[in-house]
């Protein structure tokens, strides 16, 4: 059925006005943001295709503007920019709520926080969560970009930043834009090098988390620390 042929009570905007946003399905809310479909695909169908392709709202939150191009109807810069802006606001809101919990006391909380911040980056980044003695977040810093090796991640810089923030512990992290989250031997070697360097200033390495869009890997959970 063409969107214009839907009865008024079934159209997302009218439904939201009459019954509130909570009454709408994910695809209906997304359709309100997209506003229009394309030839052969109404806006509700386009919204549902986006959700199906990226694995629901959680997967959509990890997408980039480049990822959206694979969906017919999302080729225009304006539509992609509007959706990416809304997704970024959602990520920031979720990150604020996670930070308000203050204590990063479980791998699950850490992985969720890092997914929101670096999981969808199209390039590789190395970031560090600097924590106090109660494992409360002091700051997340992205320290290096590009292919990460022992020669591109400098232990001295990580140690310097830990001293600057007076951190008691850290969580190391980086992303794999390729999608694979298995650590390489270089990842494991780098972790041990940084762990040894930070131990000299009594800073504990609690974990090294690898993330990609929709996936994460904790070295601590796997017994690699």
From Swiss-Prot:
CDD domains, per the entry: MPN_DUF2466
Binding site for Zn(2+): 174, 176, 187
Coiled coil: none
InterPro entries according to UniProt: MPN (IPR037518), RadC_JAB (IPR025657), RuvA_2-like (IPR010994), UPF0758 (IPR001405), UPF0758_CS (IPR020891), UPF0758_N (IPR046778)
Annotated GO biological process: proteolysis
Domain MPN: 103-225
Name of the featured protein: UPF0758 protein Vapar_4033
Classification lineage: Bacteria, Pseudomonadati, Pseudomonadota, Betaproteobacteria, Burkholderiales
């Amino acid at each position: 059925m063409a969107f214009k042929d839907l009865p008024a009570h079934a159209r997302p905007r009218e439904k939201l006005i009459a019954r509130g946003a909570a009454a709408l399905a994910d695809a209906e809310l997304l359709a309100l943001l997209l506003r229009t479909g394309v030839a052969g695909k109404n806006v509700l169908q386009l919204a549902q295709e986006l959700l199906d392709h990226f694995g629901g709202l959680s997967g959509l939150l990890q997408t980039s503007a480049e990822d959206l191009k694979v969906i017919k109807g999302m080729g225009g810069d304006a539509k992609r920019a509007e959706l990416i802006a809304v997704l970024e606001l959602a990520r920031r809101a979720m990150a604020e709520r996670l930070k308000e919990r203050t204590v990063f006391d479980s791998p699950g909380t850490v992985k969720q926080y890092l997914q929101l911040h670096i999981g969808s980056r199209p390039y590789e980044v190395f970031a560090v969560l600097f924590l106090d003695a109660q494992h409360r977040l002091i700051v997340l810093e992205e320290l290096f970009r590009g292919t990460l090796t022992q020669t591109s991640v400098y232990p001295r810089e990580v140690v310097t930043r830990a001293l600057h923030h007076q951190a008691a512990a850290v969580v190391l992290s980086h992303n794999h834009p390729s999608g694979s989250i298995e650590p390489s031997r270089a990842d494991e070697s780098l972790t041990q090098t940084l762990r040894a360097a930070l131990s000299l200033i009594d800073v504990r390495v609690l974990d090294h988390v690898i993330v990609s869009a929709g996936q994460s890997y904790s070295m601590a959970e796997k017994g690699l620390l």
